[in-house]
A protein has these predicted regions:
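A broadly used, surface-exposed interaction patch
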Residues: 48-111
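Conserved, mostly hydrophobic/aromatic
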Residues: 30
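Histidine-anchored nucleotide/phosphate-binding helix
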Residues: 16-21, 40-53
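Short acidic, S/G/P-rich loop/turn micro-motifs used as interaction or catalytic elements
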Residues: 11, 34-39, 62-68, 95-102, ...
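N-terminal basic/disordered segments at the start of proteins
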Residues: 1-26, 36
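Extended alpha-solenoid helical-repeat scaffolds
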Residues: 83-84, 114-130, 134, 145-148
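Hydrophobic, glycine-enriched assembly/anchoring segments
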Residues: 259-305
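Long, charge-rich C-terminal accessory regions
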Residues: 130-271
Length: 305
């Protein structure tokens, strides 16, 4: 099963909301981390997912965005108090490291919760971790001997090769082989990633000197690897203006590739939205561009598994 990990921001939630009615519930389970105090969009998304037989994992002790400086106490109760989200999600507890006893102790109050490990954990916590419904971890940050002793593991990675500037993207980058390699361990039941957004939390994007469109794909001739094509604008790249013109330039490059290689990308909801945008040369805004890329990424992986 695929576990896309997203922040509870507008476009990430829109992505999950729109995909809920078209993706098979048996293929994916989103992991959502609240990052602001606006709960209505999150609640609506939980409800939409549940209506389509998906129970997302929702981090109930978030630590990013609004919650980097504000307490998340009461978040679970707030979501349970609303009939649109009550009992429609799985609480997920974020554990920073082996010293995070506060987070580990939460599991006693939420016995069916999942655990999300940000880094390494000690052998002394194994019994606690194995009482969780599942444990999400990054194999590059957790001792393999610990991983092997856990019962129900979901491995995730921060796979998107994010650049500081859009101008620094090459035409293609390797993403991950986790969609295949996760099956090698018998105690691993799924894999996850941060789509094309990356693990780092950013409140908003910077000025658009260059507009980039990121399109994920699994090549049928090399299905063990996922890659990402990056279509970048070059016009007015010294000025943070003309985002619409820059987007259209990148979009033309994208569809020139598609015309020459019509079977490389899956026909997804996200790709159909890019196609509709291309048909009328409409710039929907940079947030929606990322949204379309996220939709395409998630659906492509669901199609594969």
């Amino acid at each position: 099963m695929y576990y896309p990990i997203l922040k509870a921001k507008r476009h990430e939630l829109n992505t999950l909301y729109d995909l809920a009615s078209i993706l098979p519930a048996t293929k994916y389970r989103p992991v959502i981390e609240p990052v602001n105090a606006k709960y209505k969009p999150l609640i609506a998304t939980i409800d939409q997912l549940h209506n389509n037989s998906v129970s997302p994992l929702v981090i109930i002790n978030p630590s990013q965005g609004h919650f980097a400086k504000n307490s998340s106490a009461g978040l679970f109760g707030l979501l349970q108090a609303d009939p649109k989200s009550a009992n429609k999600f799985v609480p997920c507890i974020k554990v920073k490291d082996a010293a995070d006893s506060t987070a580990l102790s939460l599991l006693a109050s939420y016995p069916n919760a999942a655990i999300y490990l940000e880094s390494d954990i000690g052998a002394g916590s194994l019994s606690v971790l194995n009482s969780a419904s599942c444990v999400l971890l990054n194999q590059q940050k957790v001792d393999e001997s610990i991983v092997d002793k856990l019962h129900n593991v979901v491995v995730y990675s921060d796979s998107f090769a994010k650049k500081k500037r859009n101008a620094d993207y090459t035409s293609k980058s390797f993403y991950s082989g986790l969609h295949v390699s996760y099956k090698k361990k018998s105690n691993v039941s799924g894999f996850g990633d941060f789509t094309i957004m990356g693990e780092e939390y950013l409140d908003s994007g910077g000025p658009a000197f260059v507009v980039a469109i990121h399109v994920s794909y699994i090549d049928a001739t090399a299905p063990n690897s996922m890659h990402v094509h990056h279509y970048c604008s070059t016009v007015d790249d010294k000025l943070p203006t003309n985002s619409g013109g820059k987007y259209k330039e990148a979009l033309v490059k994208m569809f020139a590739f598609i015309a020459a290689n019509p079977t490389v990308y899956d026909n997804t909801l996200g790709l159909s939205e890019f196609r509709a945008s291309y048909a009328i040369m409409h710039f929907p805004g940079l947030g929606l561009v990322k949204e379309m890329s996220m939709k395409h990424h998630i659906e492509s992986l669901c199609n594969y598994i």
